[in-house]
Regions:
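Conserved N-terminal beta1-alpha1 strand-loop-helix module at the mouth
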Residues: 1-128
């Protein structure tokens, strides 16, 4: 397995293309209003449409509603979902797209238990 690079918080096409041409494998769009890098799905769509083949477009969420995930994923033409909140495995599993689950590392955390809970996740992102 090789290391993959995702550049997150993209809001402009020129930044996305610069990231990709510099070697990024994936481009992340933050669909969380509390972020300074928040983007609307209608703004993300032309950026995702400009991406070369084999670049993964990722929607980043923090405790979203299922309607918001469906809407943004469809409009923005996403290829992968990334959840950073307290989303349950059942919540994450309901979407047609693959997902990554972020885990906020705590001193007493059992990583194996967490990995077992999110078995459907394509990856776990360890956030320190």
């Amino acid at each position: 397995m090789r290391t993959r690079v995702k550049i997150c918080g993209i809001t402009r096409t020129e930044d996305a293309l610069a990231a990709v041409f510099s070697g990024a494998d994936a481009i992340g769009f933050v669909f969380w209003q509390q972020s300074s890098r928040n983007i609307l799905p209608q703004q993300a769509r032309p950026i995702t449409k400009s991406m070369p083949a084999f670049v993964t477009t990722v929607g980043v969420y923090v405790d979203p509603t299922d309607d918001w995930v469906h809407e943004t994923a469809s409009i923005a033409n996403l290829g992968l979902l990334q959840f950073h909140g307290n989303e349950s495995p059942e919540f994450c599993d309901q979407f047609a797209l693959p997902y990554v689950k972020a885990l906020r590392i705590k001193e007493d955390m059992d990583l194996l238990e967490y990995a077992n809970r999110y078995q459907s996740a394509k990856a776990l992102l360890l956030d320190t």
